[in-house]
Swiss-Prot record:
Involved in pre-mRNA splicing. May also be required for cell cycle progression at G2/M. Belongs to the CWC complex (or CEF1-associated complex), a spliceosome subcomplex composed of the U2, U5 and U6 snRNAs and at least BUD13, BUD31, BRR2, CDC40, CEF1, CLF1, CUS1, CWC2, CWC15, CWC21, CWC22, CWC23, CWC24, CWC25, CWC27, ECM2, HSH155, IST3, ISY1, LEA1, MSL1, NTC20, PRP8, PRP9, PRP11, PRP19, PRP21, PRP22, PRP45, PRP46, SLU7, SMB1, SMD1, SMD2, SMD3, SMX2, SMX3, SNT309, SNU114, SPP2, SYF1, SYF2, RSE1 and YJU2. Interacts with CEF1, CLF1, NTC20, PRP45 and SYF1. Transmembrane segments: none annotated. This is Pre-mRNA-splicing factor PRP46. The lineage of its organism: Eukaryota, Fungi, Dikarya, Ascomycota, Saccharomycotina.
Length: 451
């Protein structure tokens, strides 16, 4: 084969070539190639034919059985997919082929690294989620939810109706109702080291509840406006709270004394998270930033400014030292050690995102103001499922919002609180397989990107 009869001038064409190979691998289990990929394959048919010919002629090629070629781009994709052998063989042949036909000015190391990086981003398959149970009982929007962190037997919700309710996770039955706030309960957090529940409200108060007695034992005063978010430090007897007054307060949970106030945000704070090591506090705000805080020094370690609108939601990964953040049409993940951008998610046209949750199986959930539930592969940023929440009878169109969420401790159940006053529990479809439920098509050229 003459290496001079087909020269490619730019890396865009290199990317397209590698994308076609990846598509072969990604959809190898499907009987038919998706239509939108069929047209793309047509555009690269000649190049793929040359690649196939090169593989057969290569002395290092030792594939077993029938050697299927790409002399045409078939509708029956299961046949063409047989040409996709092991990842190791593709690494070898694709790299050699590129070195043979592409301009020498395109650095070999750059091309190979780019291909290996693309391969590493291939999303893991996850079973789809489906509605398992609907729970009713609140008289207002369900604004917050937290799971029993010790035994995984119950969960608690807070609402616009000023109450909190404790529910049995297995049966969905109401265990008890906690009343004490006089305005909307915006967030709740349950300690895994003490029998304590912390709640914050638009009434400017922070309350500590003894769950063994189901009564308030402490009030924390100091915020000048409504309090939106609370988080318990995983190793210290501290809680962090924040809200409309744009400051974060760290409290000694035993003495009700504010230990430190963190100042820096230029707008109301939507969410705060605590981690065991620096940055020990992560916050997001309507000022379109995410801030990482040095608690000992009492100052910002880093400001993440990639978002363009109010950052309404964040979620810590249960295993990795990373965090996901979301604003309208934009979800990103960050390494917390340095505040480095990890992934841009396929989140265009998702609308306003109110809540994020991540489980230990690398499933990221995003709940939207439009009532859409989106599920992503956390590593690659690929959206593999999107479904609309079930509307309750008598609810208004403006009450479709998914406002809060949490996975249980196993990661196998997702609990959402919604504007139609309902609580919904979702489970993965245990009968689903890759073949029966492949999920939304994955396109390597979309915006999802792992850095």
């Amino acid at each position: 084969m003459d290496g001079n009869d087909h020269k490619v001038e730019n890396l865009g064409d290199v990317d397209k070539f590698y994308s076609r190979i990846r598509w072969n691998n990604q959809f190898s289990y499907m009987a038919t190639l998706p239509p939108h990929l069929q047209s793309e394959m047509e555009g690269q048919k000649s190049l793929l034919m040359r690649y196939d010919t090169y593989r057969k002629e290569s002395s290092s090629f030792s594939g077993e059985g029938k050697k299927v070629t790409l002399q045409h781009v078939p509708t029956d994709f299961s046949e063409a997919s047989q040409a996709v052998i092991s990842k190791k063989d593709h690494d070898t042949h694709a790299s050699a082929f590129v070195n043979k036909i592409f301009q020498p000015e395109v650095a070999e190391e750059l091309i190979v690294n780019r291909y290996e990086k693309l391969l590493s981003q291939r999303p893991e398959w996850h079973a789809p989620w489906k509605l398992s149970r609907v729970i009713n009982g609140h008289l207002g929007w369900v604004r917050c939810v937290a799971i029993d962190p010790v035994d995984n037997e119950w969960f608690i919700t807070g609402s616009n109706d000023t109450t909190m309710k404790v529910w049995d996770l297995a049966t969905g039955k109401l265990k008890t109702t906690l009343a004490g706030h006089v305005m909307t309960v915006r967030d709740v957090a349950v300690s895994d080291r003490h029998p304590y529940l912390f709640s914050v409200s638009e009434d400017k108060t922070v309350k500590c509840w003894d769950l063994e007695k189901n009564q308030i034992i402490r009030d924390y005063y100091g915020h000048l406006s409504g309090v939106r978010t609370v988080s318990i430090h995983p190793t210290l007897d501290l809680i962090a709270t924040a809200g409309r007054d744009s400051v974060i307060k760290l409290w000694d949970m035993r003495t009700r004394i504010p230990v430190i106030t963190l100042v820096g945000h230029k707008g109301p704070i939507n969410q705060v998270q605590c981690t065991p090591v620096d940055p020990q506090v992560v916050s997001s705000s309507t000022d379109a930033t995410v801030r990482l805080w040095d608690v000992v020094a009492g100052k910002t370690m880093k400001v993440l400014t990639h978002h363009k609108r109010s950052v309404r939601a964040t979620a810590l990964h249960p295993k990795e030292f990373s965090v996901a953040s979301a604003c309208t049409d934009d979800i990103r993940s960050w390494g917390l050690a340095e505040g480095s951008l990890l992934t841009n998610f396929e989140s265009e046209k998702t609308g306003i995102i109110n809540t994020l949750s991540i489980n230990q199986d690398d499933v990221l959930f995003a709940g939207g103001d439009n009532g859409v539930l989106s599920f992503y592969d956390y590593k690659s940023g690929h959206k593999y499922q999107s479904l609309a929440t079930r509307e309750m009878v008598g609810s208004l169109e403006g009450e479709r919002s998914v406002l809060c969420s949490t996975f249980d401790k196993t990661g196998l159940r997702l609990i959402t609180g919604e504007a139609d006053k309902s609580i919904k529990i979702w489970k993965q479809d245990e009968t689903a397989t890759k073949e029966s439920e492949p999920g939304l098509a994955w396109n390597p050229n979309l915006s999802a990107k792992r850095f």
